[in-house]
Design a protein with these regions (language model features):
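Short amphipathic, basic-aromatic surface patches that mediate peripheral association
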Residues: 61-69
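An anionic, turn-rich surface loop/hairpin at beta-sheet edges
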Residues: 93-123
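Post-signal peptide N-terminal segment of mature Sec-exported envelope proteins
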Residues: 29-51
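Internal, hydrophobic beta-strand segments that form the core of beta-sheet-rich folds
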Residues: 126-138
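Bacterial signal peptide processing site
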Residues: 22-25
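Bacterial N-terminal signal peptides that target proteins for export
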Residues: 1-9
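C-terminal motif of bacterial Sec signal peptides marking the signal peptidase cleavage site
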Residues: 17-20
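Short coil-to-beta strand junction motifs in C2/discoidin
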Residues: 70-76
Length: 138
């Protein structure tokens, strides 16, 4: 399983935060997976500065995978403290990367495909620095 996520999936967890009212992107960041792979014990951290209070945000993550990724899906555990800086909300999410026939979902070119995973929404009550933590469940 160690090599499962090596070189064939890039979690660009471009953890996107979009203001619900006007579709403006509040935060977008990219992290690639090391060439030695994404180990089960590895966590991706995204530190998100929020300048507005009482903002309703739509949350999503983007994943890029190469066509040699051996599985149709990926499970992600996503934690964030957007609604209260001292309380963590955690969800386990499933992203279907390919259909049953092996056709990749999302958009792509050549052997690279990108899919978007909606995470949900959150109300940020105070400006501040917030964090996303993402691990895989494969």
């Amino acid at each position: 399983m160690k090599n499962l996520l090596r070189n064939s999936i890039w979690i660009l967890l471009a953890t996107c935060l979009t203001a619900a009212c006007n579709e403006n992107t509040v935060y977008h960041s990219y992290q690639s997976i090391p060439t030695e792979g994404w180990k089960k014990s590895d966590t991706l951290f995204f530190n998100v500065p929020i300048k507005d209070s009482l903002a309703l945000l739509q949350l999503s993550a983007e994943i890029r995978n190469e066509s040699n990724y051996a599985y149709r899906n990926i499970y992600l555990t996503v934690s964030h403290n957007l609604e209260n800086s001292t309380v963590w909300k955690t969800d386990t999410l499933l992203l279907i990367l390919a259909d049953k026939e092996g056709k990749w979902n999302g958009t792509g070119w050549g052997s690279l495909f990108q899919s978007t995973l909606p995470i949900g929404s959150a109300i940020v009550r105070h400006p501040g620095n917030y964090t996303f933590k993402i691990t895989h469940g494969m």
